[in-house]
Amino acid sequence: MAVELKELTKRSENYSQWYNDLVVKADLAEQSPVRGCMVIKPYGYAIWEKMQRQLDDMFKETGHVNAYFPLLIPKSYLSREAEHVEGFAKECAVVTHYRLKNAEDGSGVIVDPAAKLEEELIIRPTSETIIWSTYKNWINSYRDLPILCNQWANVMRWEMRTRLFLRTAEFLWQEGHTAHATREEAEAEAQKMLHVYGDFAEKYMAVPVIKGVKSANERFAGALDTYTIEGLMQDGKALQCGTSHFLGQNFAKAFNVQFVDKNNKLDYVWATSWGVSTRLMGALIMTHSDDNGLVLPPHLAPIQVVIVPIYKNDEMLKKIDAKVEGIVNKLKAMGISVKYDNADNKRPGFKFADYELKGVPVRLVMGGRDLENNTMEVMRRDTLEKETRSCDGIEEYVQQLLEDIQNNIYQKALNYRNEHIVKVDSYDDFKEQIEKGGFILAHWDGTPETEDRIKEETKATIRCLPFDADEESLTPGKCMVTGKPSARRVLFARAY
């Protein structure tokens, strides 16, 4: 059933409802019969595929290869790394039986009690344990290192409060798992992959991010350090867009993965893991979109240019078809994804609204008068500005326009982010400022107790200790809550 554009809630009225409306009405995703699991629709999946393709290229350029590991993990594997199991225990889905049978009373299918597994299996919440049990078979000597593997997969975390793309029980992601001979090499890998994520977010998603290291409280379960990229959404909330973890030797020790080093000594392997998920779709939607619908960065838009004819009869349509064919072919030859929508089952006005809703970056329109004048109407989705251009050289103009749109939406998001970072020195000012949204740089005494208190009283968390902090932020001061010494300012926000 067709969706009317007017049904979209305004951001200023209810931002959360606007987001939910937009995901469904732009045909990105919908709820499924399984609580917390979503159906990613073809248009939404096409955006994810473009993200996936670009990230995959970036991983391969940095020497990584793809592999695939089992969905099911023996329960005993999770017990081997105490912090890890503690971090994920409450979210694990457990497989206990391997067979169904028809009920004797004809009431339907039941679990066969005779088919109980000897050991329960966990549907992967993340794959460190199954991968490190495998790496044990692959690694004997320093010559076997490094191992630089990535996996594209689905994972299951039994979330109680779910939202499409942002927090779902099942989601798609990639997870990199690397093994190294030295601590220095592993730490460098974890930071390198964080910078890959940062480059992807800024150059392709047009989402400005702050890179930094997580506090101990916010660290990944089983990691020695967690690095993060943090984006700021239009409602002033932060969104963690990707993380990279330096795991030390924790998993190598848990699974006894040792190697003979260059000095012929036995040592445990050093590890990293890193991942981004379909949560990036949420970041993309919330960073750029407006009350008319999606605003997609051209680098990730499934359709970069749509062409719509306006005609009075079949004869006029044939002439427009002939004129447009050459333009379509030239755009495709430039590597631009273009759709010519001459279907007669929808009126032009409906098509305009639908492509605006779906965030197509550039719309070209040709009518009878345009045909006579050798012109087209050009509309850019980010500003909704229209102009009439000659068809001569329009392909080069559109190519440049797509780059201008990509740069413009990044700059707009960057300006918003920079306007919503403030420094505060007192807890009262912090509590007042956090209600306005945005990032806050403030002093903290470094203790988890103070961090927990701030979270409990304000719902704000430490997003990271930013890498690119200014000199004043790196200067020691006093904790805004306790007055105790603080090594530096850290970045706070309320977050998704």
UniProtKB/Swiss-Prot annotation:
Keywords: Aminoacyl-tRNA synthetase, ATP-binding, Cytoplasm, Ligase, Nucleotide-binding, Protein biosynthesis. Its EC number is 6.1.1.15. One of its GO terms (biological process) is prolyl-tRNA aminoacylation. CDD domains: ProRS_anticodon_zinc, ProRS_core_arch_euk. One of its GO terms (cellular component) is aminoacyl-tRNA synthetase multienzyme complex. GO terms for molecular function: ATP binding; proline-tRNA ligase activity. It catalyses: tRNA(Pro) + L-proline + ATP = L-prolyl-tRNA(Pro) + AMP + diphosphate. It holds the Pfam family ProRS-C_1. PROSITE patterns: AA_TRNA_LIGASE_II. It is found in: Cytoplasm. The keyword Repeat does not apply. Catalyzes the attachment of proline to tRNA(Pro) in a two-step reaction: proline is first activated by ATP to form Pro-AMP and then transferred to the acceptor end of tRNA(Pro). Belongs to the class-II aminoacyl-tRNA synthetase family. ProS type 3 subfamily. Consists of three domains: the N-terminal catalytic domain, the anticodon-binding domain and the C-terminal extension. Homodimer. This is Proline--tRNA ligase. The gene is proS.
